């Protein structure tokens, strides 16, 4: 009798989470909360949104980038957060974890584009970019982790 492990793992919205410098980042995180991670030390860039009414902004330093979009409610919403240090996912992946560690934690049902491995939830419709989590790799070792929130496609 032989049993093989299931390489498919179910991705839940709660899996789209990472702790950066001790602050939890999820698809529901407020931009103000995320800005506390920077401790006031970040650069800002902005551009008129092609999809939303208002300005899209990027807040970044050497190890963290936060991308936002203007919501229909007038508030600034998280589009994507990308961390290169002091980060751990809800399933225990950190900088320096191997691709095998990622597969053990998240399964093998991912999309690989170059050196980026992505796991996504289904989008609510075909006009949306799906929420997901991704891992940037170098020699199959994690060098950055990102979370993407569902948002309108451009």
Can you annotate each of these PLM segments?
Residues 6-12, 71-73, 152:
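Ligand-recognition elements built from short beta-strands and adjacent flexible loops
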Residues 14-15, 64, 77:
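N-terminal trafficking/processing presequences and adjacent post-cleavage segments
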Residues 18-25, 86-93, 132:
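Second-shell loop/turn segments in exported
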């Amino acid at each position: 009798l032989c049993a093989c492990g299931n390489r498919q793992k179910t991705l839940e919205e709660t899996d789209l989470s990472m702790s950066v410098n001790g602050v939890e980042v999820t698809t529901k995180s407020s931009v103000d909360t995320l800005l506390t991670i920077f401790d006031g030390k970040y650069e800002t860039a902005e551009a008129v949104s092609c999809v939303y009414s208002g300005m899209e902004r990027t807040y970044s330093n050497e190890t963290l980038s936060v991308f936002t979009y203007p919501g229909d409610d007038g508030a600034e919403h998280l589009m994507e957060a990308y961390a290169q240090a002091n980060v751990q996912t809800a399933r225990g992946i950190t900088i320096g974890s191997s691709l095998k560690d990622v597969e053990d934690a998240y399964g093998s049902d991912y999309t690989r584009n170059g050196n980026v491995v992505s796991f996504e939830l289904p989008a609510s419709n075909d006009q949306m970019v799906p929420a997901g989590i991704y891992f940037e790799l170098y020699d199959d070792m994690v060098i950055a982790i990102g979370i993407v929130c569902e948002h309108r496609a451009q």
